[in-house]
From Swiss-Prot:
It is found in: Nucleus outer membrane. Core component of LINC complexes which are composed of inner nuclear membrane SUN domain-containing proteins coupled to outer nuclear membrane KASH domain-containing nesprins. SUN and KASH domain-containing proteins seem to bind each other promiscuously; however, differentially expression of LINC complex constituents can give rise to specific assemblies. Probably part of a SUN1-containing LINC complex. Interacts with kinesins KIF5B and KLC1. Residues 347-404 form the KASH domain. Residues 1-91, 277-347 are annotated as: Disordered. Its main location: nucleus. The gene is SYNE4. The disulfid bond with SUN1 or SUN2 is required for stability of the respective LINC complex under tensile forces. This is Nesprin-4. InterPro entries: KASH, SYNE4. The keyword Transmembrane applies. It comes from Homo sapiens (Human).
């Protein structure tokens, strides 16, 4: 029986088990008795060749797991058996059936998908570092190519099974369909895991690439931070920063009148202050070499600050002296008054709190007396009117007293 469905795009419109020059009906499903007449019959070698050409797996089936695995090779066919016809003595062959081809290819694909799933599991467990992610991406691409080849083999096997099911018994096709569905579901699960791992690796690669580019940018910036011809700041150096010559010697830390290179300098006193009378250093004298202009500016700044400090100190001293002078001026008069008065009399300053306490005590007594005198001044006539009346209920019996 001929299968009308093609295996895949590579085989074109050629039927499944009919290569060019192969017979259409004979030597496919079962054995036929060859008559004793002079008709041509195929030899065992030709039958085996035709069986492999017609029922062997197509080009899609050749992309299985690489290595020494048996699944990588096309299924091996058993040697066709022959027997002698008692009537004519001619030999007839038993070529392998399409169901056996389908089972062999299904086993091969199952082993291939198991190997791909194991490789995918190893890739999933080996993530976590940039170098591992890079190598994992390369391995994932190779795994994806192998998985696509296996998927094409599964598609070709499903098409072959559908064509075989149209010419087989319903019971045999039910078991075959269940096997093929399980194989397709396993292929789809591997594809889903592959896509998830690919998305994870892409995200890892993006993150690690950004981190690496950031590290490289920082390294380049760190290399470019070394002082160039324009100094540390380069062409953007601000004009207010001191130069290297200004930083060689600090006039404020001058000890013993030494200059920038250990030169002895002389100090000249300036004009005395009008308030404090002290003379501050007006400027630096001339030593072996003249001082720099920045040094004279620093001296002027120091002299101005010193003058302000002396002026503030003089103002504080003057403010402190004024109340002390007032106390000193008032103390002789107080002593004279105390001497003129009676030595046994108390001090008038001590009498003020006593009079205040006495006034408070008298006010308290007045309030207490008013509290006791106000209720008694009203009289007995007014007392009854001020007492509040309590409400009461009067019961009157219309028909007499109630029965006892």
């Amino acid at each position: 029986m001929a299968l009308s469905l093609p295996l895949g795009p590579r085989l074109g419109s050629e039927p499944l088990n009919h290569p060019p020059g192969a017979p259409r009906e004979a030597d496919i499903v079962g054995c036929t008795v060859c008559p004793a007449s002079g008709e041509e019959s195929t030899s065992p070698e030709q039958a085996q060749t035709l069986g492999q050409d017609s029922l062997g797996p197509p080009e899609h089936f050749q992309g299985g797991p690489r290595g020494n695995e048996p699944a990588a090779h096309p299924p091996r066919w058993s040697t066709p058996s022959s027997y002698e016809d008692p009537a004519g003595g001619k030999h007839c062959e038993h070529p392998i059936s399409g169901l056996e081809v389908l089972e062999a290819e299904q086993n091969s694909l199952h082993l291939c998908l198991l190997g791909l799933g194991r490789r995918l599991q190893d890739l999933e467990q080996g993530l976590g570092h940039w170098a591992l992610a890079q190598s994992g991406m390369v391995q994932l691409q190779a795994l994806q190519v192998d998985l696509r080849g296996a998927a094409e083999r599964v598609e070709a096997l499903l098409a072959f099974g559908e064509g075989l099911a149209q010419r087989s018994e319903p019971r045999a096709w039910a078991a075959l369909e269940q096997i093929l569905r399980a194989l397709g579901a396993y292929r789809d699960s591997i594809f889903r895991r592959l896509w998830q791992l690919q998305a994870q690796l892409v995200s890892y690669s993006l993150v690690f690439e950004e981190a690496n580019t950031l590290d490289q940018d920082l390294e380049v910036e760190g290399d470019s931070d070394w002082p160039g011809p324009g100094g540390v700041w380069g062409p953007w150096a601000p004009s207010s920063l001191p130069t290297s010559t200004e930083l060689e010697w600090d006039p404020a830390g001058d000890i013993g009148g030494l200059g920038p290179l250990g030169q002895k300098t002389a100090r000249t006193l300036g004009v005395p202050c009008e308030l404090c009378g002290q003379r501050g250093p007006q400027g630096r004298g001339q030593g072996l070499e003249e001082a720099d202009t920045s040094h004279s500016r620093q001296d002027m700044l120091e002299s101005g600050l010193g003058h302000q400090k002396r002026l503030a100190r003089h103002q504080r001293h003057s403010l402190l002296r004024k109340p002390q002078d007032k106390k000193r001026q008032a103390s002789p008069h107080l002593q004279d008054v105390r001497l003129e008065g009676n030595p046994g009399a108390p001090d008038p300053a001590s009498r003020q709190p006593l009079t205040f306490l006495l006034i408070l005590f008298l006010l308290f007594l007045l309030l207490v007396g008013a509290m006791f005198l106000l209720p008694a001044s009203g009289g007995p006539c007014c007392s009854h009117a001020r007492i509040p009346r309590t409400p009461y209920l009067v019961l009157s019996y219309v028909n007499g007293l109630p029965p006892v």
